[in-house]
Amino acid sequence: IAYQSGSNAKIYNPVEYKGTVKVNGEIKDVSRKVYQQNDIDFNYFDETTGLTNLERMQAGKPPIGSDGNPIQLHHILQKEVGPMVEIREITHQEYYSQLHGVIEDGASFRNNPVLNKQYNNFRCSYWKWRAEQIIGGN
């Protein structure tokens, strides 16, 4: 996925995340495609937490984006499990209607306690995995 923004191109690299999480004692497969931003500054120092972006990710937290806010993981099809994209919080807010208009009101997976917990567990695991990919050079 790529889009042009003035003379700068933002490129998202598609990767296959393979993994499982435990939800209420049951193992769930949370493998999916994730479109990763390639412009995250992993050395950025977050004064609030005292951690670099890479250290935040190693702790299961999202890195801070160029807008000064944590990077969001957006469900492209609004389904858990489903493909995701890393986007800036400001983009997530600015295009909220367009990004979330694919499902009816009240139909969000977040209304299902098991799926919501599954996603929250995935999110923490994903950022740790993403940090390992950076450290390992993959």
Model feature map: region roles:
Residues 3-138:
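Catalytic toxin/effector domains delivered as secreted proteins or via bacterial secretion systems
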